[in-house]
Regions:
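Short, flexible/disordered intra-domain loops and linkers
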Residues: 36-39, 69-85, 117
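Short acidic, S/G/P-rich loop/turn micro-motifs used as interaction or catalytic elements
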Residues: 34-39, 105-109
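Loop/turn elements at helix/coil->beta-strand transitions in domains of secreted/extracellular proteins
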Residues: 26, 60, 94-98
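Gram-positive cell-envelope targeting signals
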Residues: 1-33, 42-45, 53
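Short, polar/charged alpha-helical segment
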Residues: 38-62
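Acidic, glycine-anchored loop motifs typical of Ca2+
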Residues: 54-65, 72-78
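A structural signal for short loop-to-beta-strand junctions that line the ligand-binding cleft
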Residues: 118-192
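Extracytoplasmic "Venus flytrap"/periplasmic binding protein-like
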Residues: 82-140
Length: 193
């Protein structure tokens, strides 16, 4: 009887986790030289969600922003940077993320590994040996939704609206190249891209 109860509880727990697990419609990479506070990530997700659609058909629009921390400076925790690299490479190889927000410090720390990764602003793919990354990014303020975004100070947070605004204003936006990725030729995925 005890074994049966345990099996039922285990199966119930598994089914519950499957049913309540939220799958984002969009996962956006935030590649920075600092750790964005949780309130900053949440506000960024709220900013982007009204412009997104229900890609997975579950009746909800969910945007997830994932922060990857990279820097050439000594002020970044080595363990955190290594964990970011592992997550970044896994997400990049699975094509989970197609939109990248990045600051100069993090981008400079990574750019030697990004040949052919992004597409140019006109939608064409960068070649593997291309180094003209400035043609594959636009500034935060050049995106209307971001330019209008007004962060708010949340009670008990160290990061004020002014600090968050400054951090956001340093960001640039790049899109992953679809050519050569696993989404190439998949109509639904290309529509997302």
């Amino acid at each position: 009887l005890l074994v049966t109860v345990l099996v039922v509880a285990l199966v119930g727990s598994f089914v519950y986790s499957l049913v309540t697990n939220v799958h984002p419609d969009y996962t956006i990479a935030l590649v920075t030289s600092y750790s964005m506070p949780e309130t900053g990530l949440n506000q960024l997700e709220e900013c982007i969600t009204p412009y997104a659609d229900d890609r997975n058909g579950d009746g909800k629009v969910v945007v997830s922003v994932v922060n990857y921390v990279f820097s050439d400076g000594a002020d970044v925790d080595y363990t955190e940077q290594e964990a970011s690299m592992v997550r970044f490479m896994a997400d990049a190889s699975s094509n989970e993320v197609m939109i990248y927000l990045h600051d100069e410090g993090a981008f400079d720390a990574l750019k030697s590994n990004l040949g052919g990764f992004f597409q140019y602003n006109d939608g064409t793919a960068m070649s593997e040996d291309a180094k003209d990354f400035e043609n594959a990014m636009i500034s935060w303020d050049d995106v209307a939704a971001f330019a209008k975004f007004q962060p708010r100070t949340e009670e008990g947070e160290l990061y004020t609206a002014e600090v968050l605004s400054e951090l956001y204003s340093r960001l640039r936006v790049s899109c992953r190249a679809a050519e050569g990725s696993s989404i190439e030729g998949k109509e639904k995925d290309m529509a997302y891209h």
